Amino acid sequence: MEQFEHISVDQAYSLLQQEDSLAVLVDIRDPQSFGLAHPENAYHLTNDTMVELMNQVDFEQPVIVMCYHGISSQGAAQYLINQGFEAVYSLDGGFEAWRRQALPIIQQIG
């Protein structure tokens, strides 16, 4: 894959739920937004955690990139492709679409 692909919320959730799935969901929203609510099992990807991601995730594993509305994730997805990741997807609609579909999220209580 030389360029990232788009993926719907339903397709992404289905991919993540497959029994033998190695797919990783990364959330690139700011720390405050991520702290308030994020998808269950999402990895918070920032400039500071990029090296950690590259050390923990094989380049062959599918990576799904999520932002707020599906715009910023496209640039981040292409960046990951350029770093050597082979299967990268930008989540259409971002976190807002994930929340609208009532998919599992971790929410700060307070």
From Swiss-Prot:
InterPro entries per the UniProt record, alphabetical: GlpE_sulfurtransferase, Rhodanese-like_dom, Rhodanese-like_dom_sf, Thiosulf_sulfurTrfase
SUPFAM superfamilies tied to this protein: Rhodanese/Cell cycle control phosphatase
Compartment annotation: Cytoplasm
Enzyme Commission designation: 2.8.1.1
Origin superkingdom: Bacteria
Keyword line: Cytoplasm, Transferase
Active-site residue list: 67
Enzyme class, broadest EC rank: transferase
Keyword Cytoplasm: yes
Predominant localisation class: cytoplasm
One Gene Ontology cellular component: cytoplasm
GO molecular function: thiosulfate-cyanide sulfurtransferase activity
Gene Ontology terms: biological process: glycerol metabolic process
Limits of the Rhodanese domain: 19-107
Record keyword Metal-binding present: no
PROSITE patterns: RHODANESE_3
Chemical reaction(s) catalysed: thiosulfate + hydrogen cyanide = thiocyanate + sulfite + 2 H(+); thiosulfate + [thioredoxin]-dithiol = [thioredoxin]-disulfide + hydrogen sulfide + sulfite + 2 H(+)
Similarity comment text for this entry: Belongs to the GlpE family.
Entry-linked PANTHER family: FAD-DEPENDENT OXIDOREDUCTASE (PTHR43031), THIOSULFATE SULFURTRANSFERASE GLPE (PTHR43031:SF6)
The protein's name: Thiosulfate sulfurtransferase GlpE
Protein species of origin: Photobacterium profundum (strain SS9)
